[in-house]
Amino acid sequence: MCIRDRAELTEPEWDKLPDEAKVLYPGKTVAKDPTACNAAESTTAAYMYLQVEIPRASVRTYTIAETAKADGSDETNQEPTSGAGVLDNGGEPHTVDLVSFQPNDGWSLLEETETEETHTFIYAYESAIAPGAQTPPLFDCVTYANVVEGDLPQGTAVDIICRLTAIQSDYVADANTPQDV
């Protein structure tokens, strides 16, 4: 429950994780749940917008080939396999998002921009949020890209930056959806 006098961004599941659980490695999925809260003590509902900035880098990546059939053979009738890594882009470095996420229902993508260093998304929640209420998380987890070991220096920070903007619905009376604001 929100109890302050403003909008706030929380990540309840992420905040519960010990630091060692937040360490990423290729293919790892970790809980991360940016949630917007209308913490205003007034009676005004607010439209909530989340901006998410994902780091990008020019690296080599790989895909796990899932070719195994139920009988243990693969589609090429070679030795049984449980999946093998196949280099993407012919093994050449290419610019990729270092993490990915799947937005939850109720959030609409308003804008998306990419540079060599970042991929930025702006999402709006589908309706105004009453004081003391919160949105469901924009997403529940993030997955680190399958980056070839050594392509990023060990200890490279993979910061996912989330920013919240709230607009009181009383000041945009003509708006019926967050996209109208």
Provide a role label for each language-model segment.
Residues 7-10, 56-121:
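A surface/secretory-pathway sequence property marking extracellular, secreted
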Residues 16-17, 66, 148-150:
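Low-complexity, polar-biased intrinsically disordered regions enriched in Pro/Ser/Thr/Gly
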